[in-house]
Amino acid sequence: MNALLSQKLLGYDNDYQLPTVIWQDNSAAQTWTDLETFGGQTESQFPLGQDQAQIQNHYDEETFEKYCKSYPTFHQDLISDKANQVTLDFELDQDIHLNGRAILQLQVKSSVSKGLLSAQLFDFGPAKRLSPIPGMVSRNSLDNGRYYAQENLTELPFTETPYRLITKGFINLQNRTDLLTVEAVTPNHWMTLRWELQPTINKLKKGDKLRLVLYTTDFECTVRDNSEWQISLDLSQSQLILPH
């Protein structure tokens, strides 16, 4: 860091080259590596199924109020397959170093002239993973922290967890091409989406299980709509695409 700051702020020619991508390896504790590029050139495709599926948007009033007051409760029901959702599980038949934006290619229709879709992709099943919240390694071991005080040294714990979020995304069907293009949603008319989820880098190995959850309202991140409509999915014309 000192070499980089000296080069950028002081104009010191020290020939330091910052790697294109610096990535914390999710398969081991305190392991950092550099990558030549962000975004894989190879794609693995996972068909979503053979049938059609429906997602109801409306919840009964008690459940809706519960989710509004506590979105972590909603997320827990989501991973447990208890919310209004479509849940799809996959087992990997090869090692995949996910690099870039996972893509959902979907055939969908809405029962009304609007529509919202949310998606979350999980590394699912008990395994050792990096936790999302840092834990303390050593108390007051860092000098000159906030307000020049000593701070705790923290690190993401590498511990067994039941699942780990890989990526997620949200799409308004009226902006299905891009955010600046408004398109009509014709009720009960099939639409084809190519939907890029949030970018990520994640190392997955053969035999790992992925869980894809598709739903409408996300009580943390989207408008909390409880009106009565549904989204239909033609799973036989839909797939998950992972770049690596």
Question: Where are the regions that the model predicts?
Answer:
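C-terminal, loop-rich substrate-recognition/catalytic regions characterized by aromatic stacking residues
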Residues: 1-244
